[in-house]
């Protein structure tokens, strides 16, 4: 029992108070996203009576504008700071989503989608950069892992809450959804008011920041290629193409699909921090290669399930498959953002995070488009191609390992702060050198001067 208790205590990430405030805001934000995003097309199509194509265009505009505004957001982060950028992005998101209840015409929805899209474009670079700025290298893996776990928890709970609130029979129920979503963004802004601004980079150094410098970092750019491939071939296929595939080929109901994705949420929430802990001291690119290998295997397992099983048996097997896939997500999540933060020079952190966001957005733009095209022609080709792409990304991760700087090659071991025991510090009375009774001997050093550097040092930020 003591061993179990000690292990659970070791999972405590021991993060600064400011980081916990950001994580709390992240929970609120993901809760709001879960409340609205799954029901946005339903609202536009069935409540506002827009065509399906028009409704889809509005949702696509959210991602498209975010893709365009992402590079600008990276510059803004490096110029005025991550916290200010994040607060501005949240204000745009609140205004954009908060205005949807007043939509009556498609052009109004597109305008609001553009406003929210600009907010989306700035949110991820601002959020990720702020976490990196307020943590040391040793704390970042835990901070980003906690963010991933809480985001999944918030989105899952939000989706459940949204499903219980929204009904097309009562159009005003969607007004409540959008109001709650806007409220979560505003709540995050309030929490950020209590987060100290990170140490500013000197203006002379900030002025030298260019995207050209980022693009010349070949190791980082190839890392982003690997990330984009994994997002397109794994994340996008599982989140968008898996549901229609298993519904058509394995007779899995909507309820069964919901159970499968609930397993995904539970596993990530439960396993992210323990896996991050287990990865301390491990090579990051090998961990990323392992994640790619897991994604490849699960794509093949999804194909086999669709071909050979159906109904309840398919749901049971797919739950196990998605549980394994979720472990791959945890491995990927424990490596990606901390590695990007460690590769980025301090004055280019926002730009590096913006490029990372663009890699994800490109993956989610290309993945569903290619996936649905292949699904219509040959489901087997879809999942075989996805598995092959994930395997190629795994090999690419191993080939890239030699290009990663040694200081960033391994996941740092978390700094362990010993528990504070009661201690009396004896103070030695020493005589001044100019005292007439002095023998001329030098004063002895204070005992505290040889104490652990943890005493009185402050948290190091990078």
Task: Briefly describe each language-model feature range.
Residues 1-17, 195-229, 414-435:
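Juxtamembrane intracellular "pre-TM" segments in multi-pass secondary transporters
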Residues 12-63, 219-264:
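Helix-loop boundary and gating motifs at the non-cytosolic
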Residues 67-104:
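Conserved MFS/SLC helix-loop-helix module at the cytosolic interface between two early adjacent transmembrane helices
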Residues 69-81, 270-285, 375:
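Helix-to-loop junctions at the C-terminal end of transmembrane segments
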Residues 84-99, 182, 287-303:
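Structural signature of the two symmetry-related core transmembrane helices
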Residues 112-153:
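Cytoplasmic helix-loop-helix junction between adjacent transmembrane helices
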Residues 163, 183-201, 396-401:
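C-terminal membrane-cytosol helix-exit motif in multi-pass small-molecule transporters
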Residues 287-332:
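C-terminal transmembrane helical hairpin of 12-TM major facilitator-type secondary transporters
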């Amino acid at each position: 029992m003591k061993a179990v208790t000690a292990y659970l205590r070791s999972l405590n990430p021991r993060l600064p108070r400011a980081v916990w405030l950001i994580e709390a805001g992240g929970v609120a934000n993901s809760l709001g996203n879960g409340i609205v995003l799954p029901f946005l097309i339903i609202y536009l199509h069935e409540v506002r009576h827009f065509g399906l194509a028009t409704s889809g265009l509005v949702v696509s505009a959210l991602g498209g504008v975010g893709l365009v505004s992402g590079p600008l957001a990276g510059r803004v982060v490096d110029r005025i700071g991550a916290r200010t950028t994040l607060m501005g992005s949240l204000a745009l998101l609140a205004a954009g989503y908060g205005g949807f209840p007043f939509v009556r015409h498609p052009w109004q929805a597109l305008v609001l989608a553009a406003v929210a899209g600009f907010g989306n474009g700035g949110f991820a670079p601002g959020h990720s950069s702020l976490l990196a700025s307020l943590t040391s290298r040793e704390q970042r893996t835990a901070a980003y892992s906690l963010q991933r776990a809480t985001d999944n928890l918030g989105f899952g709970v939000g989706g459940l809450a949204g499903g219980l609130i929204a009904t097309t029979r009562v159009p005003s129920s969607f007004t409540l959804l959008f109001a709650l979503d806007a409220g979560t963004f505003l709540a995050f802004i309030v929490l950020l008011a209590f987060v100290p601004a990170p140490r500013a980079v000197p203006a002379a150094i900030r002025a030298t920041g260019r995207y050209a410098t980022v693009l010349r970092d070949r190791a980082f750019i190839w890392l982003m290629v690997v990330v984009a491939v994994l997002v397109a071939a794994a994340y996008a296929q599982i989140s968008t193409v898996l549901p229609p595939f298993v519904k058509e080929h394995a007779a899995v109901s909507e309820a069964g699909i919901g159970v499968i994705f609930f397993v995904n949420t539970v596993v990530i929430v439960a396993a992210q921090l323990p896996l991050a802990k287990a990865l301390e001291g491990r090579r990051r690119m090998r961990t990323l290669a392992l994640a790619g290998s897991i994604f490849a295997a699960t794509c093949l397992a999804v194909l086999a399930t669709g071909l050979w099983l159906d109904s309840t048996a398919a749901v049971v097997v797919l739950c196990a498959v998605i549980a394994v896939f979720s472990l791959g997500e945890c491995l990927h999540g424990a490596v990606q953002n901390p590695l990007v933060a460690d590769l980025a020079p301090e004055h280019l952190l926002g730009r590096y995070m913006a490029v990372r966001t663009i890699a994800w957005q490109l993956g989610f733009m290309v993945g569903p488009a290619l996936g649905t095209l292949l699904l219509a022609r040959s489901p087997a080709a879809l999942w075989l191609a996805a598995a092959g792409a994930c395997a190629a990304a795994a090999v690419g991760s191993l080939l890239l390992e030699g290009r990663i700087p040694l200081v960033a090659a391994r996941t740092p071991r978390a700094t362990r702060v010993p528990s504070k025991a009661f201690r009396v510090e004896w103070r030695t009375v020493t005589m001044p050198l100019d005292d007439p009774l002095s023998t001329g001997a030098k004063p002895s050093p204070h005992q505290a001067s040889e104490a652990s550097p943890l005493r009185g040092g402050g948290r190091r930020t990078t």
